[in-house]
Amino acid sequence: MHNGILFLFLFCAHLLGDFYFQPPALAIKKEESYFGLLLHALIYMTFILLVFLFVETPWWLLLVASVSHYIIDSAKWLLRTSKLSNPMLFIIDQFLHLLTLWMLSILTPEMAIRSWLSILLPTFWPWLTLILLVWRPVNVSVDILFEKYAEAAKEEKKRQDLELAQKQKAAEMLANKATFEQPAEDLPELLEVEGAGAWVGTLERIITVLFVSMGQFAAMGLLMAAKSMARYDRISKGPAFAEYYLIGTLYSILVAIVAYLFLFKIVFPVTSVVLPTPIILMTPSPLP
């Protein structure tokens, strides 16, 4: 029997230390030098040790969680020049981290949260973990796992913008108007908002888990339809982007559903949302 509440707090600490408080600069430094890896390990250990403030946890368990994370990351650092691809290293790395936290929750007896946290609803912690999971970690995983599809979509976009710019310039030259001053290479930066796609994906996953919690699976189809309508023009004109869009959308929804089922059916099996009792209309029975 696993210790569900302990796993939730350890998993939250893992998400915070491995994703939210690991900026891109530190991630790059971690790949280039061992000092960056040590700095990341110290930040991660800080969040793991903070679990003691929330759950009555022995110190040795928190130290084991911190040291095991450092060992796994060190092995990944040594394998960075191997034949394993970045997506494969990322999957193995996160799987081992998750497995370690799960084993620690199994090997420890049931532990209670601190008394000052009793004012919060029991479902607060799995919901907090779920939101943390489907936000930045999934965005990072999309960038790593589907990097080649994203690059193909970007190259396709640049080619389309260049062709459009050339057509516009040719039309202006024919009309004897030399008003086109913006280089074609700058057009993609003017036409796209940086980070908008990541926010769309995050909101999509949050809405998905809300629909799943309420049993409204049909509403997920409407969500996908609305998202597809917003991107219809680019999907219809760019096969590379269409593939990347479809893969990213299906992956995003799949992760949201699996994350919800894992946290609420396996780790912390409680009813997250109480659905109202359906109203049944009945005809009055005739009087005797």
Annotated model-derived regions:
Residues 25, 47, 104, 222-226:
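Short hydrophobic alpha-helical segments that form membrane-spanning helices or hydrophobic packing faces
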Residues 48-70, 77:
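Transmembrane helix-loop-helix
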